[in-house]
Amino acid sequence: MRLSNRFEKHVLVAAAVAMGATAAANAAVVYSGILNFSCAIDTDGTYINVETGQLTNGPASLVPGWDVNPYRSSSGSGMNFFSPTGGGMVSAAAGVGSAINLSAGTLIGASSNFSSATATISFGSAAGQWQYASNNIVGFRFVSSAGTTHYGWMRFLMGSQPASGNLVTRTVVDFAYESVAGASIAAGVPAPGAIALLGVAGLAGTRRRR
């Protein structure tokens, strides 16, 4: 057997094992894929229906049944979140109007603390604070069209710190949620890198067919 063939065989086996483990761990996770959607920096902001995958810059009437609404208030730290009844963003304490930046792998579920209807963010170096010019992950809960509570995460790429004011840019990179009602989800899972593994397997298969 040629060395290249043996290498491709090992790649396929490793990819299959890894994909099987990923599928088992995330069988109920619904992932958006990479979106890179630029949010409007105004008081309407962006309305996101995580079940249908629809997101657009306001008004709210454009996205029926929306679940997450990042927007900019006329004053504040740069971005706010508004949640419909039953929703909320993961916060440092229950009912506190803040949305914290989560480390990858943090579990989001019934035992998490959630904000009230409106939540703000703050930038800084302390745990839970958001970072300029970086990806930040926020956790959320929402009530599905079936009336059940689900948990998810959303990744935002925040722009560089503005010279003045609170006009920092914000981009929805991706999001995911648990399709099983009440089930917890790990922040940032599945990661884009895990999905890229499919491309590795596909490449190896293509080379073998030649």
Describe the predicted segments one by one.
Residues 209-210:
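Membrane-interface capping segments at transmembrane-helix boundaries
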Residues 28-152, 157-188:
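A domain-level signal for the mature, folded cores of soluble proteins
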Residues 4-30, 178-206:
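Short, threonine-centered small-residue motifs that mark membrane-proximal processing/anchoring sites
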